[in-house]
Amino acid sequence: MESFRRFSLLSFIALLAYFAFLASAEHHVHQFVITPTPVKRLCRTHQSITVNGQYPGPTLVVRNGDSLAITVINRARYNISIHWHGIRQLRNPWADGPEYITQCPIRPGQTYTYRFKIEDQEGTLWWHAHSRWLRATVYGALIIYPRLGSPYPFSMPKRDIPILLGEWWDRNPMDVLKQAQFTGAAANVSDAYTINGQPGDLYRCSRAGTIRFPIFPGETVQLRVINAGMNQELFFSVANHQFTVVETDSAYTKPFTTNVIMIGPGQTTNVLLTANQRPGRYYMAARAYNSANAPFDNTTTTAILQYVNAPTRRGRGRGQIAPVFPVLPGFNDTATATAFTNRLRYWKRAPVPQQVDENLFFTVGLGLINCANPNSPRCQGPNGTRFAASMNNMSFVLPRSNSVMQAYYQGTPGIFTTDFPPVPPVQFDYTGNVSRGLWQPIKGTKAYKLKYKSNVQIVLQDTSIVTPENHPMHLHGYQFYVVGSGFGNFNPRTDPARFNLFDPPERNTIGTPPGGWVAIRFVADNPGAWFMHCHIDSHLGWGLAMVFLVENGRGQLQSVQAPPLDLPRC
């Protein structure tokens, strides 16, 4: 009898805790109106595509356990879809967003409501358009706080400052893309980088709009840094101030201090900053980290960290006190970029798979398509070719008549094939002098199937075809553990012995070292069609992508949900 009472009491307490959890979760309803908006930068006004007339778009703030319903109303002249970058979308690929992968795009005049739940995630993520180059101006922060009463693994500051790094073209980005697609050449590089949508003091007609962040002496703030740029890894620093890194891609890290961070497109990094310097004005700045032998935007964007009540003028008639400028690494400082990345560690012992069921090896890199007429205006790449990119020599082509996920769910043939190779079809010296016969990839819409709950390891190997380069690879629907990396060709006999299987960093986007490799592991516990691609949008457009098809497990709770009734049609 006593044991029954004890059991009943424990059950009652558990039930109360469950209802308290339900009561603490909120449902957020938003409306995203996609519309052209006049935006003036670099002395000129452009009709930029925005959300709710804002550039950058609105910041979404939620807690772990909350749910969202975001209705996207497309009043622009382009097809669009929205991706909630880093949200796992468990069993719900219909809300993931990449056009022609998990949904057909939202056409002009149409509406679609993304419905999803935040499940066991917290930290800094973001959202952006996933339709061609619309994400150049259609993006915003997505901040997930812990459940009420849940602690942080570090002393949490009272104030957050979202820092969205972007790129700006002095013309319509869709026209930049259209020109590159026609000529086969590389797209024109951006004309400016931005911090929260503003280029900063170093660009023409930009000083008045420079973002200023007030801070009190002695105050510690958390900077939530997001690289929303299209095509460029960036170094970021604040003059005379140190950062304490505490999170990357919504996963906590063992804290460490640094003067500079390197952040690739798609990645997020949270840092703590304490105002412990002489009261004044200090530039925060971002400039390119460029590991490729290719043109890039070699400008610098700035904002100002301004101590409250600090003097801003030298005296009557003597002008303003110029902000202190940070020392940034050189644009090609791979040593600094690598040293930063190598210091990242998961904040505690990580639940990384110790054994693997799927051992995959993917080459990632550029390529060239030969032209029958090298003098054609459509063949203005190197030596009369067209640029391409591939994984395992397969250059991904988006379908047009249906999305991969819809075709997979409905069993519709002819949209994709499941013969993406698990290893390169031809093995070669990946980082050496590669024969020109291996520079031309094969085009196709190819996917690779994974069994539910299989332990997956992928080695991503950069190649020297065209140029070695840091490729920020993003996997939809998953977080993964970065268990190892190195330069040169991956050695399957010796390199795994150096893997970190204790506290590897957890990410959703990771760069391949230029001329090197990176190894990741994850458990395939989220059924559906999940895009894996380079987050440099030029490379994605050239085909540096593939799709994983993760099969259903057993029963409803291990299977993909039914598609929503308002899912857009092609």
Curated annotation (Swiss-Prot):
Glycosylation sites: 79, 188, 298, 332, 383, 393, 433
A GO CC term attached to the entry: Casparian strip
Positions contributing to Cu cation 2 binding: 85, 128, 535
UniProt signal peptide: 1-25
Pfam family, one: Cu-oxidase
UniProt KW keywords: Apoplast, Copper, Glycoprotein, Lignin degradation, Metal-binding, Oxidoreductase, Repeat, Secreted, Signal
Chief place where the protein resides: secreted
Cofactor stoichiometry and binding remark: Binds 4 Cu cations per monomer.
Subcellular location: Secreted, Extracellular space, Apoplast
Positions of Cu cation 4 binding: 471, 534, 539
Binding site for Cu cation 3: 130, 476, 533
Enzyme class: oxidoreductase
Needed cofactors: Cu cation
GO biological process: one example: lignin catabolic process
Plastocyanin-like domain sequence ranges: 33-149, 159-310, 419-554
Binding positions for Cu cation 1 per the UniProt entry: 83, 474
NCBIfam families listed in its UniProt record: laccase
Protein name: Laccase-3
Organism listed in the record: Arabidopsis thaliana
